[in-house]
């Protein structure tokens, strides 16, 4: 019954996405992080103390998330096995963000096609951290493709990977790791100390899924008749062209598959950040690259599901 829950949850994410009014564990994790962070900042004042406080924050959030997830699943299964199955489906469904990522990217795509530049910039600002106020259409398009490529790892591939390793509770714990990084894992003066542990552990958690994305996205490129040879070549060549040890793997692979260049300098919080270019500019970026990148992400997600399900079947059984 475990594998059937995986596939049903995957289909639910594909069909429904994340309706904004539905309860979602990530919001609960965010509330817990905010509460604990406030308490730690009250108790810890030096940079050294905040670093240790950040480690405690990470341990508490990840530990509580795993324990509550495991306890909830155990309780539902004890009441009735089918109730446990439904609980597992719901948990996995909330972990996957493929449809949500697709919808966010297509919202910018639609604004670029039918709306104004200001609308496109505003919708892009909802999904990226860079300053979007001065971006033109090619830069907006490039930013959307980068976001789809990067988030294909932590939005789908990595949750499925940890689902294979330790079931829904471990996958939920991974989501807590990812949420911690997105909330406190910054290098700004405010978060550098308290978010140090969260940032490092997120890098560690995504290390293998990011490298698997090179293979999965290249295979996806072959299936959708994109340039899989360049996906493999550029994905390997430019795998370290990023300050993160993980982000460039998926970005470079998508850049190679589409034949465009990603990365480059951007503005963050009023400061110019010089980033290396990723990929070869065999042509100018086009609006059609947004749906093509989504297609790549969706196909790679399906391949990840099949690969991890097959691995689980061979090692554990149904």
From Swiss-Prot:
InterPro entries: Cobalamin_biosynth_CobD/CbiB. It is found in: Cell membrane. GO terms for biological process: cobalamin biosynthetic process. Keywords: Cell membrane, Cobalamin biosynthesis, Membrane, Transmembrane, Transmembrane helix. GO terms for cellular component: plasma membrane. The chain crosses the membrane at residues 56-76, 78-98, 153-173, 204-224, 298-318. It is a multi-pass membrane protein. GO terms for molecular function: ABC-type vitamin B12 transporter activity; threonine-phosphate decarboxylase activity. The keyword Membrane applies. Disulfide bonds: none annotated. Pathway: Cofactor biosynthesis; adenosylcobalamin biosynthesis. Belongs to the CobD/CbiB family. Converts cobyric acid to cobinamide by the addition of aminopropanol on the F carboxylic group. PANTHER family: COBALAMIN BIOSYNTHESIS PROTEIN CBIB. This is Cobalamin biosynthesis protein CobD. It comes from Yersinia enterocolitica serotype O:8 / biotype 1B (strain NCTC 13174 / 8081).
């Amino acid at each position: 019954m475990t594998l059937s829950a995986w596939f049903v949850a995957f289909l639910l994410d594909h069909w429904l996405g994340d309706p904004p009014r539905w309860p979602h564990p990530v919001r609960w994790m965010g509330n817990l992080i905010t509460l604990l962070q406030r308490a730690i900042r009250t108790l810890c004042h030096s940079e050294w103390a905040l670093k240790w406080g950040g480690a405690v924050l990470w341990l508490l959030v990840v530990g509580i998330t795993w324990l509550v997830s495991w306890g909830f699943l155990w309780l539902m299964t004890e009441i009735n096995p089918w109730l446990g199955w439904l609980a597992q489906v719901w948990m996995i469904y909330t972990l996957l963000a493929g449809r949500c990522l697709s919808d966010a990217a297509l919202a910018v795509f639609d604004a670029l096609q039918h709306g104004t530049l200001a609308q496109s910039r505003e919708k892009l600002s909802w999904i990226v951290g860079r300053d979007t106020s001065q971006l033109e259409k090619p830069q907006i398009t490039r930013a959307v493709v980068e976001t789809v490529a990067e988030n294909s790892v932590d939005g789908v591939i990595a949750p499925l990977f940890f689902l294979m390793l330790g079931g829904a509770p471990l996958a939920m714990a991974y989501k807590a790791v990812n949420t911690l990084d997105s909330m406190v894992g910054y290098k700004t003066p405010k978060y550098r100390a308290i978010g140090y542990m969260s940032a490092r552990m997120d890098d560690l958690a995504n290390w293998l899924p990011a490298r698997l994305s090179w293979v999965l996205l290249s295979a996806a490129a072959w299936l959708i008749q994109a340039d899989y040879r360049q996906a493999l070549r550029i994905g390997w060549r430019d795998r370290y062209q990023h300050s993160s040890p993980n982000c460039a793997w998926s970005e470079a692979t998508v850049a190679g598959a589409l034949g465009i260049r990603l990365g480059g300098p951007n503005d963050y919080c009023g400061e110019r950040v010089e980033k290396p270019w990723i990929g070869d500019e065999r042509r100018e970026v086009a609006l059609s690259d947004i749906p093509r990148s989504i297609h790549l992400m969706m196909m790679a997600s399906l391949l990840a599901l099949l690969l991890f399900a097959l691995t689980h079947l061979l090692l554990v059984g149904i």
